[in-house]
Every structure is written in structure tokens, then in C-alpha cells.
Amino acid sequence: MDRRTYLKSGIGVLGGGLIAGCTGDGGSGDQATTTAESETEMETETETDTPTETATATPESNIPETVLIGSDIPYRPFEYQTAGGDLTGFDVDIAEAVFEEQLGIGYEFQATSFDSIIPSLNNGNFRIIMSAMTINDTRDEKVDFSDPYFTAYQTILVRADSSISSRADLEGEVVGVQKGTTGAGAAEELQEEFDGDLELNRYDQITGAFQALTNGQVNAVINDNTVNAERASQTDELRFVEGDGVAADSDQDAPPYLTLTIENYGIAFREDDDEFLERVNEALAAIREDGTYDEIYSEYFSG
């Protein structure tokens, strides 16, 4: 697999878990700290007791002047910090295209644990979620989703010298997953299929699962294909488990590795935020129509 570097000029860190995006007038937030990108977990704000969203709406509408976005950071290549402390990634660029360029409003990202991100949204800690979040029935009972903006697959990442070459080979092994994710859900389904003969180690962030795989504490990681690919592109020590899977069975243009699920990402809203949801859907359609979406996609995932 060819190695790639997914870096792009991004946005400054404001501190306190808040990461600034561009404002409606085209300016960007001042960078208050410079943080080298690390495989360790970022400080996150996970409290759900007190609403913190303060952005005001534009006159005679429910559209904010600046939208506060909850996101589990880092989650390369969707949202992460560069060595210079800038926030970048596919979701970040989509946010810029949707909110700044289409809706003319500012945006800020707030780092939040994925496991508690939906309760935090519904408690008013931020306005929306953009965090490579899969649309599924369980989440749809608690939030409303935008139209899908990305298709992903759950995949299996192992060490290069591993004897694991199929999903069946996972029986009796130890698998690392991130808490609250559909990767964890896919692993739990395998655990049931194997009558419990699959041990799951759950981590607050996917970087913890990747580190455990490298260190030999788990034998595989189940996670989104693009995030697994980003990690595998950085080292010769990791590889995908290959073979046909759900995508191939569905006659889709399947990736060249085993797929456990087919999923669509969406932007999550509180269930009473219909006007803003509609405007965001219109903006998503517009960036697909004018080619902006394809440009962003090609930057992170083509080649």
C-alpha cells in the first residue's frame, strides 16, 4: 500500500478544548497554543451537565452566526491536528465548505469523547456533531441526521506478521475497538457469532487501539476503512485483512480488503433543529453540484 501524507493548512487551537474555524468574514481564530501532533489522547470535554453553547442565531432565523461542532479529535484523516497545532482533515474541510462558503457563518470544533458525544449534543454543549459518525437506527432515535456525505466500511487491521487472514481467524483472539463506535458494534456481532470466544478491549480513542495493536496487546483492530488505511500508510508493520466481504456481496465497488459493514456518515443535529438541518442539507447538495466535494475528497482519499 502506498504511503500518503494527509496534511493541509488548518485552523488554530484556542485552548480549553475549543478549536477555532473560519469566521463568516473570512478571518480565522488566533492560535493560542502550538501543539505537536501526538498519538496520545487530546484533552476532551465530556461533561454533559451544563449546556455551554453560546453562539447567537442570525436575526429572524435559527441559523447561528457561529456553529459549535462536537468532534472526537484526533480521528485521522477526518479531524486531527498538524505538527503546527492546526486542525485539519476531511470533516474540517467539509465544514469550511458548508458553513463558511455556503451559509456564510463561522464554525468552531470542540473536542469531545465519542462515547458521550450524543448526550453532550442533546444537552446543548454544541450545536451539531461532525465526527465521522455513522447513521444508524440506534442513533437516529436520539438525533436527526443530515443527508449522507460519506460511505465507509468496517475493516480489520492486523500486524504484518499476523497469521490472521480471514474473519474466522479472529475467533479466540483479542480485538481492539473504540468505545461507542460502529467498529465496536461490528466486533460485538463477531463475538456473538463466535459464542463469546472473542475478547474485546475498548479504548476511549482509536489511537489507543492502534498503539495496543503495535505493542501486541491486541491481535487486531476493527474500525473504519479510511482511518485504518491512514494508520497503515504510516508503517510497514500493519496490514488489512483481505478478502471478499459485505461490500463485494452487495455488488458495490468494493475496496481491496475484507469489509464487515457498509455505512454512511451524517452530520448529527438535535431533533428540534429542523431549519438548520434543512439549510445544511441544501449546502451539502450545493458542494456536490459545484465540484467542491469532489475536490476535498480527492485531496484525502484519491491516489
Residue map of PLM features:
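Terminal disorder- and signal-encoded targeting elements
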Residues: 1-112, 116-169, 173-303
